[in-house]
Design a protein with these regions (language model features):
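Alpha-helical substrate-recognition element adjacent to the catalytic core
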Residues: 1-75
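Alpha-helical segments flanking ligand/cofactor-binding loops in enzyme cores
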Residues: 36, 40, 100, 119-120
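Short, acidic/turn-prone active-site loops that include or flank metal/cofactor-
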Residues: 71-79, 133-137, 149-153
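Short amphipathic alpha-helix with an adjacent loop that forms part of the alpha/beta core around
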Residues: 154-164
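Short, well-ordered alpha-helical microsegments
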Residues: 56-60, 118-119, 154
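Substrate-recognition "cap/lid" segment bordering the active-site pocket of phosphatases
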Residues: 57-109, 140
Length: 165
């Protein structure tokens, strides 16, 4: 991860890309089809926390489109001229650590994600689901239910909501 991020930062410096440039591009992106409706519906029964391996500074344009659920992620180090100089990772397994912390203070967690780095939180969540995960990933974890649309994911959340203690 460090090598990849160092390479990306080097490319951004070489191409004189600033944080504003990147945020502008991200701001032009739309949420995935069904995501906004999913969030509106899920909030009727659940508190929503986004656990992400992104950075706050990159996520803010999309967070506004989601009505700002709680976001726990990493932080960029940005210089005076908005050049990205580095980053601070909260923890190498931040998603898993966050779920464990919520569990320790009495919360029961239901998690959804789309990649390998989400499987660590599925291990400690009460329930875990893949959403839009590539089959190359979901097929390696056949015990984790996998969904390709937000309506089915919403039904899965509703089906286990009474399991929470």
């Amino acid at each position: 991860y460090d090598d990849l991020m160092d390479y990306r930062i080097k490319l951004m410096k070489e191409n004189k890309l600033t944080l504003s440039d990147i945020k502008y591009s991200i701001g032009k992106m739309d949420l995935l089809d069904g995501a906004q409706t999913f969030l509106q519906n899920i909030r009727k029964y659940f508190q929503v926390v986004i656990l992400s391996d992104t950075f706050y500074e990159f996520a803010m344009p999309l967070m506004s489109k989601m009505d700002f659920p709680l976001l726990l992620c990493h932080k960029l180090n940005v210089g005076d001229l908005e050049q990205i100089e580095g980053y601070d990772l909260r923890h190498s397994k931040a998603k898993k650590q966050a779920i464990e912390a919520f569990n320790q203070i009495g919360y029961k967690c239901i998690a959804a994600g789309d990649s390998y780095n989400d499987t660590q939180m599925f291990e400690v969540a009460e329930h875990g689901f893949f959403i839009n995960a590539p089959s190359s990933i979901s097929s390696q974890y056949p015990h984790i239910p996998s969904f390709s649309n937000y309506n089915d994911l919403l039904d899965a959340f509703y089906s286990v909501k009474d399991d929470r203690k």
